[in-house]
Design a protein with these regions (language model features):
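Active-site C-terminal subdomain of aminotransferase-like
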Residues: 1-63, 69
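Short, flexible turn/loop "capping" segments at secondary-structure junctions
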Residues: 25, 41, 89-91, 120-124
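Short, solvent-exposed loop/helix junctions and linker helices
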Residues: 35-39, 101, 137
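Short alpha-helical functional segments enriched in proximate histidine and acidic residues
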Residues: 51, 74, 78, 150
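Conserved PLP-binding catalytic core of the aspartate aminotransferase-like
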Residues: 65-72, 76-114, 123, 130
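PLP-dependent enzyme catalytic core of the Aspartate aminotransferase-like
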Residues: 110-168
């Protein structure tokens, strides 16, 4: 079997497992992919990034912090089963907010089924990306209302939310 000379997450057997050791995909040419996008993809990216020419990053960060703080406050007020896993200090946190919940995977699947998109990290972390480019305060409040409903009704306990999906 030919082994890749360079390793990259595109060719990893489990690219989203975040393992420190590289394990190439078994028996596939994909194992040779290293993680560098093609020139054509970069040219499209260049065009897409033009929108950032007129965005003030300080204003964007300020709005992100305001939305994140509102999200944390709403969850802590309405969803006592969740525990903040992210740093409380906004300067240490960035635009992701994470909460611990014993049934985090199933709860995230229930949220996704309701149109609230976040992701899950083992063993029990529910992670949300908070960006003012796509979200506003009403979106944040509505997401927490949906989360609260899922927790109160234990909708996360439904069988369809228990089965773990595989990431390919």
């Amino acid at each position: 079997t030919v082994q890749p000379a360079l390793s990259g997450w595109f060719g990893h057997e489990a690219p989203f497992a975040f393992d420190l050791d590289f394990r190439p995909m078994p028996g596939k040419i994909d194992r040779m992919r290293i993680g560098t996008p093609s020139i054509a993809a970069f040219s499209l990216l260049d065009a897409a990034l033009n929108i950032w020419d007129h965005v003030d990053m300080e204003d964007l960060q300020k709005a992100s912090i305001e939305l994140s703080e509102a999200f944390i406050g709403e969850i802590e007020a309405r969803c006592s089963d969740l525990k903040l896993a992210s740093p409380r200090d906004a300067n240490q946190r960035g635009s992701h907010v994470s909460f611990e919940f014993e049934h985090g995977y199933a709860c995230m699947q229930a949220l996704i089924s309701e149109g609230v998109i976040g992701d899950f990290r083992s063993p029990n972390i529910m992670r949300f990306g908070i960006t003012p480019l796509f979200l506003n305060l009403n979106d944040i409040k509505q997401a927490v209302v949906i989360l609260e409903k899922i927790l109160v009704t234990k909708a996360w306990a439904k069988p369809e939310f228990q089965k773990r999906a595989l990431v390919n």
